[in-house]
Design a protein with these regions (language model features):
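Hydrophobic beta-strand positions that form the internal "hydrophobic ladder"
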Residues: 21-23, 70, 115, 167, ...
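Conserved strand-to-loop turn within each blade of WD40 beta-propeller repeats
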Residues: 25-31, 73-75, 118-121, 170-173, ...
Length: 363
């Protein structure tokens, strides 16, 4: 058992179901396109349970844990698989082709019976899924929003609030948008736009690379990076989505002076894991929104990350699959302040002892 392994191809996406890890990898001449299933253990990448060689490069994975079904997007279609009860095989159960044929898909999300799909051109589509017994019976398009963004849709999240259903999208155009999809018989309705430009006036082209939404709290976190190579910066922002008509930025911090590519939330919603393009991981404490630890674990871009309990699993374009323990530590300033407080208390206690003749030092 190891905490880092080389799987021989660039890692594009990760998906965790129960204590298993699915890895989508491939791309590049002479490199194999693969779907691999691993057993996860605390601190280690365990046994390889399944390895499928694919004809096309799997770019992104999303799944439905309760049904042991997941999908991968490959250019203009999504291929759905079911996982056998003994975790020993994948079975292809449905292929959804997206028109037009030159469409390049980069994101999708499944919530209950609804599938939302985003492509490289900023188009947004909505589908209804009919499930059978660990299978998909049919998928039908129920909505479409032309030019939802003017660049690719990197991430999609669902939000339910007061019996209403919304989509949140994050795009390479630097914007996040909210759409009302409550009534599937009516067109998708644009509600509002929120952007890092509300907070930061530096003339730079910022891209919304990733988005995490916390249901119940109606809080979202976005990671946005500058595309200006000379002034490359990445920021993490916390947003209040309780009023979908007027999204409010709550906090923002500078994470890195390099572009950051992905983020994920740990299971108790207390920490974020963030990866950058030069092999570094950041752990962010959401209580106060501060980086509590950062660690250089490689030299290549860490393209994706997923939390498994209090461990962060990362995949790099340099073929490395790795698992690292969440490390939180006191900020140095806090330690200094604590030292000063203890020193003052010690002096006060010494004065008290001297004043009451409880101590007698002779030199």
């Amino acid at each position: 058992m190891q905490n880092e392994i080389d799987i021989g191809s660039p890692i594009n996406s990760l998906y965790i179901i129960e204590d298993k890890l699915i890895v989508a990898c491939g791309g590049g001449p002479g490199l194999k396109n693969k779907l691999i299933l691993y057993q996860l253990q605390l601190g280690y990448i365990g046994e390889k349970l399944v390895e499928n060689i694919l004809e096309e490069t799997p770019k992104f994975i999303e799944g439905i844990p309760s049904k042991k079904i997941f999908g991968i997007c490959c250019d203009n279609h999504i291929i759905f698989y079911s996982i056998s009860q003994d975790w020993k095989s994948f079975k292809k159960i449905y292929t959804l082709d997206i028109n037009p044929k030159d469409t390049v898909l980069i994101s999708f999300k499944i919530y209950q019976n609804t599938l939302a799909v985003g492509d490289f051109e900023g188009e947004l589509k909505l589908f209804n899924i009919t499930f059978g017994n660990n299978e998909i019976v049919s998928i039908n398009e129920i909505g479409f929003f032309h030019n939802a963004h003017w660049r690719g849709i990197n991430k999609i999240e669902f939000m339910s609030k007061n019996k209403l259903k919304f989509l949140i999208t994050a795009s390479g155009d630097g914007n996040c948008k909210i759409f009302d999809i409550t009534d599937s018989t009516k067109p998708i309705t644009f509600i509002t736009n929120f952007s890092f430009r509300q907070l930061y006036s530096e003339p730079a082209n910022y891209c919304m690379n990733d988005l995490i939404f916390i249901p119940g709290k109606n809080i979202a976190y976005t990671i946005q990076s500058s595309k200006n190579d000379k002034k490359a910066k990445s920021f993490l922002t916390k947003w209040d989505l309780n009023n979908v008509n007027l999204v409010t930025p709550l906090e923002t911090i500078n994470i890195s002076n390099l572009p950051c590519s992905s983020l994920d939330l740990n299971e108790n919603n207390k920490y974020l894991g963030i990866t950058d393009v030069q092999g570094k991981i950041f752990f962010v404490d959401l209580n106060g929104l501060r980086v509590c630890n950062e660690e250089q674990i490689g030299e290549n871009q860490l393209k994706c990350c997923k939390f498994y309990k209090n461990y962060l699993v990362t995949g790099s374009i340099g073929y490395k699959l790795r698992i690292d323990k969440l490390k939180s530590r006191f900020n140095l300033a806090i330690l200094k302040n604590l030292f000063y407080v203890l020193a003052i208390l010690g002096i006060c206690y010494y004065i008290y002892l001297k004043k009451n003749n409880l101590i007698n030092l002779e030199i």
